Amino acid sequence: MKKQSKGVPTNRDIRWDRLDNTAHLFPVIAGESMSNVYRISVTLKEEINPELLQRALDMVLPKFDGFNLRLRQGVFWYYFEENGKAAPKVRMENNFPCRYIQQNKNRSYMFRVTYYKCRINLEVFHVLTDGMGGINFLKELTYQYLRLAHKDLQEKLGDSLSVDTSLNREDSFLKNYKKSSAKGYQTKKAYLIRGEKLRPGEFGVMHGYMKIPELKRVCHAMGISINEYLVSVYIWSVYTECLHGMPSKCPIRVAVPVNLRPYFNSITTKNFFVMVSAEFHPTKARSTGKILKSCFPITFPMKNC
C-alpha cells in the first residue's frame, strides 16, 4: 500500500473547479511563442531577503484557493484541480519576463515569484486570474513579507489576511450573463507594427517613468482618465514614429483590457474583464487631442485640444 505524502490531498478530498468563461481560451493558445503570462511587480525601499520571501509565499499560498491549483485536461474541457504541493521556489530573476510557465518544472503551479534587488515580481498564467486577481495576491504576499522582515509589524498586525484581501471565487461572467440577440460587426485589418523578431521565450522590455501628480494634472485638465490618456499617447507614438504622421488605409488599433468588477459590484479573484478596442484612422495630420477624440468619443469632452 502506498503511503500518502504529507500535505498532499487524497483522491477523495481533492478540490476541483471550472475555468471561468474567459479562461477556456488560454490553455489552447498558450505556448513558448505566446505565453499568456503577465507580470505585476512591487518595488520596496530595501533589498529583498529571498528566504523571508519564500516563507511569506509558503504562508500565503494555502489561503488562496485560486492560486493553489494545477490545470487538468478533461474529455472536452480543461479544469482546475487542487495542487497541494509545496509552493514553487522563489528565485532571483535572471531571465526574460513573462516566459511560458512549464507546469511540470514548477511543481504544477501556474505562477512564479522572482525578485531582483528591491523588487518582487509575480508572473501569472492568465488562465488563473486577470490583473486585479494578481494584484490581490501580490499585495497579500508583500504584506506578509514585510511582517516577517520587520518585527514591529508582527506585533501590531498579527498573521491574518489584510483587510481588503479577497478570496471570492465567484464566476462573475455566469452570474451577470444576460442573453441578447447576436449582432455581427466588421472591422478593417489593423496596422501591424514591424520590427526585429525575437526567439520564442524572449521579450523586449521598455521602461518609462513619470511623476503621477503631473500625469493626473494633465488628465484632469483634459477631463479624461489616466488609461485613456496613456492609450492615446501610445497610438500617437505609433502614428508619428511608424507612419511618420502620414495617412494609412489601416487603422491603428489597441486592445485595452477593462476590469468589469466596478460595473457589476464584484470582488471575484477569477478573470472578470473584457477587451475593448481603441481605434484611430490616420487620414491626415493629427494631434494627441484629436486622437483622444477619435478613440474615446463618449468620455472625451472635446476641450483643450
Name every feature range the model reports, one short phrase each.
Residues 47, 127-128:
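Helix N-cap motif at beta-to-alpha junctions
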Residues 226-235:
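Short amphipathic alpha-helical segments
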Residues 2-21, 119, 128-136, 140-217:
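Non-catalytic, low-complexity flexible loops and terminal extensions
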